[in-house]
A protein has these predicted regions:
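Flavin (FAD/FMN) cofactor-binding and adjacent substrate-gating region
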Residues: 118-151, 301-314
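Core mature regions of organelle-targeted
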Residues: 108-119
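Flavin (primarily FAD) cofactor-binding/catalytic cores of flavoenzymes
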Residues: 3-105, 110, 154-267, 271-279, ...
């Protein structure tokens, strides 16, 4: 129903329409291929090749043997999504094995891909895989995809299907035998001065549990950003049962025959709109405040070595300028998702249409959006998440001592931004910065979260993971080495393995 981003408008102001089907439209947008008949044998061969790769690339193979207590982990990773899995393998490649990844979900349900992610395809091109393979080609997504579905299929796609990516992550964890402990919800993290480690207070299958670790990596992506952003006008005027957020568990078949309003213009708003129509919604109206849907994705511009590797080294004023510019520009859906939605007959996009008033009456939602009045059966908030570490209960006993940008940086007049000012001020390895020296233990916590997205330059997504994780892992292994330097030197002096 829509031309590319430079589309014309119809006779009604700010309603985008299309008279042609874009070349980006795909009738098989939702299709998932069937594995090859011999996929099992092909995958077995890939795993054999991978095992050979790991043996060849194992130098230096010696692991850390200086744990002060076997009851204390060297590293606890909170979250077993793609970031947590890759962090664990990267630590292993650096000889740090006393690690556990904790995840509150059951096995194969970790991360967002089978939870609230509803995009048919990933938003990044297929070759951007977050560096999960750590330089080992046979661990790369493309090798797994070709083994299971064929080289022709791999060559034919531009973006990986979301559910295939989820399958790959399952295989990644299984073939590497990653130390994932599922059904474990880390609820509080505190510092124990006597033991010089973090205490992770948790529930494991409903029972209380306590774990200890020298270092903690918070690898919970979007879920470690502060929670859902639901506009106050919706919260205050609609009953909870009448609306959802895109991060909710939504029963899409229940929307069959319904008229639905989607608020927000980012990727998740469009993803959910497509699923609503696929489930049989009569119509989906998507409304945004901006006069024009953003059509510029500077993330694509940033995908080069200089930016990814060195942005975090920039002076604070430069990082602030980049971040402020990106926030003002706004988020946009991927082109393939945008065109797929705009070519659906039941979909309409309304720009320049902020919610002015809204109410619920006799099973319907009546709202004024810009200068239009609508009534719908349901409403979905595609309004993103709040970036606020104070709203993250797992961090409640740490955040009072974590420095924010407002504590260490003053922007020029006219460049103030309250949300950015509240972001945690992270070090160059994504570690928290303590407000005072007495809380220096906070630098042993690493924040691999969407809450680090703007000012650190690392968005905790596939475009950034392979550049963020080496910084974290190097910093951890460096501290482990220096903290154990006396033991290590004693071992060095005691070494007595004669060559002849």
């Amino acid at each position: 129903m829509m031309l590319p981003f430079s589309s014309t408008l119809n006779t009604e102001r700010n309603v985008e329409t299309s008279k042609t089907i874009s070349k980006e439209f795909r009738s098989n947008f939702w299709e998932i291929p069937s594995p090859l008949p011999d996929a099992e044998q092909r995958l077995e061969q890939l795993e054999k090749n991978l095992k050979d790769d790991l043996e060849v690339a194992c130098y230096p193979g010696r692991t850390w043997d200086y744990s002060r207590s076997q009851n204390i982990l060297e590293v606890a990773i909170v979250g077993a999504g793609q970031g947590g899995k890759s962090a664990a393998f990267g630590l292993r490649q650096h000889g740090v094995n006393n690690v556990i990844i904790f995840d509150k979900r059951p096995a194969k349900q970790e991360g967002v891909w089978r939870a609230f992610a509803r995009n048919a395809k990933l938003r990044s091109p297929k070759k951007i895989t977050g560096g999960l393979e750590w330089g080992i080609p046979n661990l790369n997504f493309c090798r797994w995809c070709a083994a299971c579905y064929g080289s022709d299929y791999w060559q034919s796609i531009k973006y990986a299907p979301r559910l295939l990516w989820a399958e790959y992550l399952d295989w990644y964890a299984q073939v590497l035998a990653l130390p994932i402990q599922n059904n474990t919800d880390i609820q509080r993290v505190t510092w124990n001065e006597v033991e010089q480690c973090f205490w992770l207070h948790a529930t494991n299958r409903g029972a209380s549990a306590l774990y200890k670790a020298r270092f903690v990596i918070f690898a919970t992506g979007m879920e470690c950003a502060g929670g859902k952003n639901i506009p106050a006008i919706i919260r205050e005027n609609l009953p909870a049962h009448s609306y959802h957020h895109t991060m909710d568990n939504i029963d899409f078949p229940s929307f069959q025959g319904k008229r639905v309003m989607v608020v927000g213009g980012g990727a998740s708003a469009f993803d959910n709109s497509l699923l609503l129509l696929k489930a049989g919604a009569v119509s989906v109206d998507l409304t945004i405040r901006r006069e024009k849907l953003p059509d510029l994705n500077r993330i694509r511009w940033s995908e080069w070595n200089g930016y990814h590797r060195h942005y975090i080294e920039l002076p604070d004023r430069d990082k602030w300028a980049y971040s402020l510019s990106e926030l003002r520009l706004g988020q946009l859906p991927p082109a393939h998702t945008y065109h797929q939605a705009m070519n659906q007959s039941g979909f309409s996009l309304y720009t320049g249409s902020p919610i002015k008033q809204i109410r619920y009456e006799k099973g319907e939602i009546f709202g004024t959006y810009g200068d239009r009045n609508f009534h719908h059966d349901a409403l979905i908030c595609g309004t993103g998440f709040v970036t606020d570490i104070d709203r993250q209960s797992v961090l409640n006993e740490l955040t009072p001592y974590v420095a924010r940008w407002r504590d260490l940086f003053t922007p020029a007049p006219g460049e103030e931004h309250r949300e950015l000012a509240n972001f945690p001020y992270l070090g160059k390895s994504l570690e928290f910065t303590p407000l005072s020296p007495e809380h220096r233990y906070l630098s042993r916590c690493y924040y691999l979260s969407c809450g680090a997205a703007y000012l650190s330059g690392f968005r905790a997504n596939l475009t950034d993971l392979q550049f963020a994780l080496p910084r974290i892992i190097y910093n951890i292994s460096q501290q482990l080495f220096t903290e154990h330097k006396d033991d290590i030197y004693a071992d060095f002096e005691a070494y007595d393995n004669r060559e002849y």
